[in-house]
């Protein structure tokens, strides 16, 4: 062994920088944005990322002789400049598929981002995109139902779904919470929702909330003749409690439940998605905590990666921001990861932040959910941006109506149907937005009041996390 094994430390780039390598269709590809410490060559930084996220360690080890390192190692095969940032660069790394457990997003993320982000040789590191090979996608369960099945279950076609988050998000008793749900649904909404942090607090235990909400949903259905639903948040402190809540929602004949997939974790989310698939339940996904991970433009994980991972882990709806509301997100970036939620094939398109072609095969799509600081004036833009396969959720834009939640719901329903009708007639709904809404308001006093109430409410802040494109 001593004749074959050279102990010591060698540069990462000697093994993991392979510019001649041509990625295989079965490779998992990742794009990292890297900013190294001063004086460290780019190739060494990129190779260090490839090594630490695959087979490498800081020292040469004798046990490498017991396996085929050339087969299993990650390979940095390309480096690119980042437009507008002379310190940063993109490192493209190919990983052989055998490095990952089949169907395990938890394992993929543990490998790619689990340890390497703490490297001293790096000042910043960000995972910008992943190309999942179709061979891996076929091992994932994906959405429990998908867009087509969800529309059939809810009997909603030809327009976005319309919903709202119950406000105030915390502090209501179960009975009063149910009353607010009823007011929204009878006013014209399709769905209402628990907020991300309503679980089972002293002021409102989860079982109490579920029972009053179920009563409200069924009463609204009887009055309106429409299928209604409420996203019952089953997120809990243990997996056992998570499933107990899901089972009770099923007993109440509720069509949809909810999970906070980042705080709850991918293992819990995949398990819940599998349960929903077996039990005929729709699954709404909230992205609480995402901005801690994805908002810094140089460090963390881009939301397009988190969105792709969610589609593989499982969910029928996912919050994506609004572009026009109170939350971070520019239009092109948002369209990029909406494509990856809904389409069967998404081509590389740097103008939308997509670094790779992504083939989703036959995996069902996910509804994009627009929620956060939106109101009736935003309706034309939301329809233009998100299209029909989306869910538009107006929380304050429903409950803040001067006449109450039912009137706010009615205003949103009239605005949505007016915009859909105008779009279907060939009108340019964003350019003609004011005319379309004002025409509809002539026949809806609820909409007229809503337009007056929110006519000056805008969220015009510069985007922190911008696309890296040549200007």
Swiss-Prot record:
- Residue positions of the PTM N6-carboxylysine? 193
Question: Subunit notes for this chain?
Answer: Heterohexadecamer of 8 large chains and 8 small chains. Forms a CsoS2-CsoS1-RuBisCO complex.
Q: Which SUPFAM superfamilies does UniProt cross-reference here?
A: RuBisCo, C-terminal domain, RuBisCO, large subunit, small (N-terminal) domain
Site Transition state stabilizer — annotated at 326
Give the UniProt entry's GO cellular component terms.
Answer: carboxysome
Q: Where is the active site?
A: 167, 286
Q: Which domain of life is it from?
A: Bacteria
Is Metal-binding included in the keywords of this UniProt record?
yes
Q: What is the scientific name of the source organism?
A: Prochlorococcus marinus subsp. pastoris (strain CCMP1986 / NIES-2087 / MED4)
Q: What family is it from? A: Belongs to the RuBisCO large chain family. Type I subfamily.
Question: Which residues does Mg(2+) bind?
Answer: 193, 195-196
**GO annotation, biological process:** photorespiration; reductive pentose-phosphate cycle
Its biological purpose: RuBisCO catalyzes two reactions: the carboxylation of D-ribulose 1,5-bisphosphate, the primary event in carbon dioxide fixation, as well as the oxidative fragmentation of the pentose substrate in the photorespiration process. Both reactions occur simultaneously and in competition at the same active site. There are estimated to be 152 RuBisCO holoenzymes per carboxysome.
Q: What InterPro entries does UniProt report for this protein, alphabetically?
A: RuBisCO (IPR033966), RuBisCO_lsu_C (IPR000685), RuBisCO_lsu_C_sf (IPR036376), RuBisCO_lsu_fd_N (IPR017443), RuBisCO_lsu_N_sf (IPR036422), RuBisCO_lsuI (IPR020888)
Which gene is the coding source of this polypeptide chain? cbbL
Keywords noted in UniProt: Bacterial microcompartment, Calvin cycle, Carbon dioxide fixation, Carboxysome, Lyase, Magnesium, Metal-binding, Monooxygenase, Oxidoreductase, Photorespiration, Photosynthesis
Q: What is this protein called?
A: Ribulose bisphosphate carboxylase large chain
């Amino acid at each position: 062994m001593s004749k074959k094994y050279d102990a010591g430390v060698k540069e990462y780039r000697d093994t993991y920088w392979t510019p001649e390598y041509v990625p295989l269709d079965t490779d998992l590809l990742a794009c990292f944005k890297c900013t190294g410490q001063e004086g460290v060559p780019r190739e060494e930084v990129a190779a260090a990322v490839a090594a630490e996220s695959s087979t490498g360690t800081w020292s040469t080890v004798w046990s490498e002789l017991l396996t085929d390192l050339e087969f299993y190692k990650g390979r940095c095969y390309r480096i690119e400049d980042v437009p507008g940032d002379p310190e940063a660069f993109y490192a493209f790394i190919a990983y052989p598929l055998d490095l990952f457990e089949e169907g395990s997003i938890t394992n993929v993320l543990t490998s790619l981002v689990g340890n390497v982000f703490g490297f001293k040789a790096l000042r910043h590191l960000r995972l910008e995109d992943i190309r999942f090979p179709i061979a891996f996608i076929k091992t994932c369960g994906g959405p429990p139902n998908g867009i087509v099945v969800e529309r059939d279950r809810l009997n909603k076609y030809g327009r976005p779904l319309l919903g709202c988050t119950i406000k105030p998000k915390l502090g209501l008793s179960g009975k009063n919470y149910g009353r607010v749900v009823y007011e929204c649904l009878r006013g014209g909404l399709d769905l209402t929702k628990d907020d991300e942090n309503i679980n089972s607090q002293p002021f409102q235990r989860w079982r109490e909330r579920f029972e009053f909400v179920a009563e409200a949903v069924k009463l609204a259905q009887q009055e309106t003749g429409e299928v209604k639903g409420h996203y019952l948040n089953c997120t809990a402190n243990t997996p056992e409690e998570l499933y107990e809540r899901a089972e009770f929602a099923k007993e109440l004949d509720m069509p949809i439940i909810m999970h906070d997939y980042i705080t709850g974790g991918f293992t819990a989310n995949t398990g819940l998605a599998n349960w929903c698939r077996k039990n005929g339940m729709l699954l709404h996904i909230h992205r609480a905590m995402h901005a801690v991970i994805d908002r810094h433009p140089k460090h963390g994980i881009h939301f397009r990666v988190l969105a792709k991972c969610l589609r593989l882990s499982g969910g029928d709806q996912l919050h994506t921001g609004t572009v026009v509301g109170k939350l971070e997100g520019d239009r092109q970036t948002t369209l990029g990861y909406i494509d990856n939620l809904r389409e069967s094939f998404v081509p590389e398109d740097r103008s939308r932040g997509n670094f790779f072609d992504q083939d989703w095969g036959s995996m069902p799509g996910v509804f994009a959910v627009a929620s956060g600081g939106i109101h009736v004036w935003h309706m034309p833009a939301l329809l233009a941006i998100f299209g029909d396969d989306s869910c538009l959720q107006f929380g304050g834009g429903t409950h803040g109506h001067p006449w109450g939640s039912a009137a706010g719901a009615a205003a949103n329903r009239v605005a949505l149907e007016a915009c859909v009708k105008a779009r279907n007639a060939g009108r340019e709904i964003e350019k003609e937005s004011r005319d379309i809404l004002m025409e509809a308001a002539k026949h809806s006093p609820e909409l007229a009041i809503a337009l007056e109430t929110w006519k000056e409410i805008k969220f015009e802040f510069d985007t922190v996390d911008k696309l890296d494109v040549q200007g």
